[in-house]
Regions:
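Solvent-exposed, low-complexity, repeat-rich "mucin-like" stalks and linkers
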Residues: 78, 317-343
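Long, low-complexity serine/threonine/glycine- and acidic-rich segments characteristic of extracellular
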Residues: 350-369, 373-379
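Exposed aromatic-hydrophobic patches
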Residues: 65-71, 333, 360-366
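Ser/Thr-glycine-rich phosphate-binding loops at phosphate-binding pockets of nucleotides
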Residues: 224, 228-229
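Surface-exposed loops/turns
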Residues: 74-75, 326, 368
Length: 386
């Protein structure tokens, strides 16, 4: 139960709740029952996000007819059909549609507590953080084989960002991810709460990982998935414009770590107070001030926003740096994603000539320098510096 809507109202009852459930997360999967005629040899349920039933998840319902489905995206339309095999003949039902309720996407991962998708939270401009990109959780050291299969399969985790110190990590996992040897393991110890805002213990290094599209999907965690993990989530959510009230609710969703129980009454309060004191009129502006303070560039911040909030173009990793002109020109390697074209490029507010070919954008800057902006056909933008 999440009830902390301001700094004077936090969910102190979660300690009793956690004790009551026996230190384990509770998940409510979607349950679908299939009523079959006769006695089919095999019953399968197919579930897809696509109306044409492409790329479905397939569940075996033989003998019981009931399927519990974990890890569905929230606020999302799904399509399903049943497939039967009887007397060697395969038949299938018509396609049905159902929609999941809106809200946080909490996922049951074997051996891992407090696992949830950071997507689905509403943000400024009527947008939402995209699901399936960033996950937060507690320690992954004890992940089960089933948990690994979910993380590498359906969720497709590419990067494991560990926010703990070396002493907190099981020795066998100090250089590789418990998920898989194929997952990029990055350990960046960070400070929780207010210290994070001033660059303590790797704040900038942790945030920079989210600027590279090749790192996604990313899972980040500390020990309990609360204090350090909650601080990093707070910054990312503030940056993309999630309402402060929803950020507080997300922080309180960790069932065994209410603010008052872990760091006293002032840890989270100091984070919020320090954040509010940053320069800027909006949460996004304040987050930009802090992210610049800890070493992020405008190009990196542009990428983070476009990755999390749009399907628009982003800079490729090799172009995420200050550009030095050669013969009066600078070039950027772009992943265009769903953007189709560039409509304008400006430098210090003035339009400049450009050319786009095979994802390489060449901009004529002459002897000029400063802040530039690339605008795409879908009205998205990227910021660069010369």
């Amino acid at each position: 139960k999440a009830e902390m809507y301001d700094l004077n109202d936090f969910a102190s009852n979660t300690v009793d709740y956690y004790s009551f459930i026996g230190s384990s997360d509770l998940h409510t999967p979607a349950r679908i029952r299939i009523n079959s005629v006769g006695n089919p040899e095999k019953i399968e349920l197919l579930v897809s996000e696509n109306k044409d039933m492409s790329d479905p998840r397939v569940f075996d319902a033989t003998g019981h007819g009931t399927v519990n489905i974990n890890a569905l995206k929230t606020g999302t339309a799904y399509y399903c059909m049943a497939r039967f095999t009887a007397d060697g003949e395969e038949k299938q039902t018509e396609t049905y549609e159902f929609r999941t309720l809106d809200g946080p996407r909490v996922i049951a991962v074997g051996g891992v507590g407090n696992f949830r998708d950071m997507g689905s939270w509403p943000a400024d401009g009527g947008k939402r953080i995209k699901q399936g990109l960033i996950y937060r959780c507690a320690s992954i050291d004890n992940v089960t084989d089933d948990g690994r299969q979910l993380l590498t399969g359906l969720l497709g985790i590419k990067t494991d960002l560990d926010l703990r110190t070396e002493a907190e990590v099981a020795e066998e996992y100090r250089t590789r991810s418990p998920i898989s040897a194929d997952v990029n393991y990055v350990r960046v110890p960070i400070a929780a709460y207010r210290s994070f805002l001033y660059g303590g213990d790797g704040s900038g290094k942790a945030l920079k990982l989210f600027a590279d599209l090749d790192n996604y999907p990313i899972v980040f965690h500390c020990a309990a998935g609360a204090d350090r993990t909650g601080t990093l989530a707070f910054m990312l959510e503030s940056f993309v414009g999630v309402d402060e009230r929803n950020i507080f609710i997300d922080y309180e969703l960790t069932p065994n770590r209410p603010r008052s129980y872990t760091v006293g009454d002032d840890g989270f309060e100091q984070l919020v107070t320090g954040f509010r004191a940053a320069q800027g009129n909006t949460s996004h502006d304040k987050a930009v001030t802090i992210m610049r303070r800890v070493g992020l560039t405008d190009m990196e911040m542009s990428n983070i926003y476009n990755i999390l909030m749009t399907d628009s173009a982003v800079f490729k990793s090799q172009s995420l740096s200050h550009q030095t002109p050669s013969d009066g020109k600078v070039s950027f390697e772009l992943n265009m994603r769903k953007s189709k074209s560039v409509t304008s490029v400006t430098l210090e507010g003035k339009k400049v000539a450009y050319g786009l070919k095979n994802g390489t954008l060449t901009v004529t800057v002459g002897n000029s320098a400063g802040r530039g902006e690339i605008t795409f056909d879908d009205l998205s933008t990227l910021t660069f510096k010369v």
